[in-house]
Amino acid sequence: IYSTYEPPENSDPLEVVAMGHQWWWEFRYPDEGIVTANELYVPTDRPVRITLQSQDVIHSFWVPQVAGKKDTVPGNTNVMWLQVDEPGNYSGQCAEFCGVAHARMRFRVIAEEESNFNNWMESMKTPPRMDTSEGYGLFLAHCSMCHSIDSYNEGSYEKELTMQDERWDDWYFNQEESVRVSAPNLTHLGIRTMIAAGQKDMTKENLIAWIKDPSEFKRGTRMQSVASVYKGGPAKLEDY
């Protein structure tokens, strides 16, 4: 049993940090400088070493079809590894009660053949087409306090880690008046397969409904209590 604690020697495991948040998962690829959320892309036939951490309370990382479960504990670091041999999507779930939205703290492991995985990594490092639309301006005005969309920029990885800590401190120490909180990195959100930590498939209709009234999807989400666009109830998207 002990011999399986670490990936096989000379196997060149992919390094990933899985950070638990109430109630979503952040996935960091430190060697590639990539930060994303709720969808863990991995190559097939290659070990993946996962460093498990938590920003707030105890969570538990669990992908039933692929690996066992292990806790993420604030102030501590746990490690596990997994290997997926067949391409496909594998459902994951927080397996430790962590608050009101625990049952909706889902994620997805997306296993791709190595060439496709490498293509995904390259796409995450590629800037999107610059958008000067009103929607982009609204995102910068209202959403960028909590969400980042620039993981492709040089130095963005270190910046994102610092910003997440600062956002958390702002909210934790001033929950009544804070205007920001830790939130998923949304770089290249459009290529994701799901939204709201696995509550709905990624479609235009679901995305609009999620932005308009997050609590209808996921009770307890802090987005609606913090972001100014929700003051007084659901966002009035028709105004925009």
What are these model-predicted stretches?
Residues I1-S144, S148-V181, G198-K212, K218-Y240:
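Non-transmembrane, membrane-proximal soluble domains of secreted or membrane proteins
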Residues L186:
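"…together with the soluble PPM/PP2C metallo-phosphatase catalytic core" -> "…together
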